[in-house]
Regions:
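Conserved acidic segment of CheY-like receiver
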Residues: 5-17, 21-25, 53, 143
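Acidic, metal-coordinating helix/loop segments flanking the phosphotransfer/catalytic sites
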Residues: 34-52
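Acidic catalytic/metal-coordinating carboxylates
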Residues: 36-37, 63-66
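Active-site residues of response regulator receiver
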Residues: 56, 83
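C-terminal output helix
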Residues: 87-89, 103, 107-117, 162, ...
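Recognition helix of helix-turn-helix DNA-binding domains
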Residues: 159-192
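Basic, Lys/Arg-enriched C-terminal extension of HTH/homeodomain DNA-binding domains
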Residues: 182-214
Length: 214
């Protein structure tokens, strides 16, 4: 098994549950790391490959739902909740905040394995998206200051002549910058560049000339 093989992170204060879940998941070829508390989990090194978090709701140091809230916004593994005291409000809250599933003990092996598979697939997809975004940011970092001025103008729909006038450049010079922007951003077309700008959340620059003429 490779070091970057999928791993399931179990957080449950019951050692019998941790052992049973570990045996089941390992029998299906998955790596497992088990923790008795949220604090133990928080102190561990983050996984380097696809992962999911099997999280008990009732923990000795913090409620699992509270931990989910604390992790919000961070690049944490997708969560599958497990609990012996499930209720509708808790399950709705968990799913609303991004949990893949909410399983009430005792749950069947098939239900658990299906939830884990879905969570691992989600994490694999999210990791790929983050890697793509990181590469895109790296390409954007290669643009010169002038090219960063040109990019929002051309994705806003301005013609070369209009964008050139906006920046006080000749149209020929603007076209050179435009070609460089497309090449450095790895965009085969203007549509590709627009999508890249949207992913990078680059604000569209509206022509000051247009505003004066309006």
């Amino acid at each position: 098994m490779t070091p970057h093989a999928p791993i399931v992170l179990i957080v449950d204060d019951d050692p019998r549950v941790r052992e049973a879940l570990s045996e089941l998941l390992e029998a299906h070829g998955l790596r497992v790391a088990a923790y008795a508390s949220a604090g133990d989990y928080a102190g561990a090194a983050p996984p380097v490959g696809p992962a999911c978090l099997l999280l008990d709701v009732e923990l000795p140091d913090i409620n699992g739902l509270e931990l989910q809230s604390q992790l919000a916004g961070a690049d944490h593994p997708p969560i599958v909740f497990i609990t012996g005291h499930g209720d509708i409000p808790s399950s709705v809250r968990a799913i609303k905040h991004g949990a893949v599933d909410f399983l009430t003990k005792p749950f069947g092996e098939d239900a658990l394995l299906a939830a884990v598979a879905a969570a691992l697939a989600q994490d694999d997809r999210l990791r790929a998206e983050r890697a793509d975004l990181g590469a895109l940011r790296g390409r954007y970092a290669q643009l010169t200051p002038r090219e960063r001025e040109v990019l929002p103008l051309i994705v806003s729909g301005l013609m070369n002549k209009q964008a050139a006038a906006e920046l006080g450049l000749s149209e020929v010079t603007l076209q050179v910058h435009r070609r460089n922007v497309l090449r450095k951003m790895g965009a085969a077309s203007l549509a590709d560049l627009v999508r890249a700008a949207e992913r990078l959340q680059i604000p569209i620059t509206h022509s000051r000339r247009r505003e004066r003429e309006a």
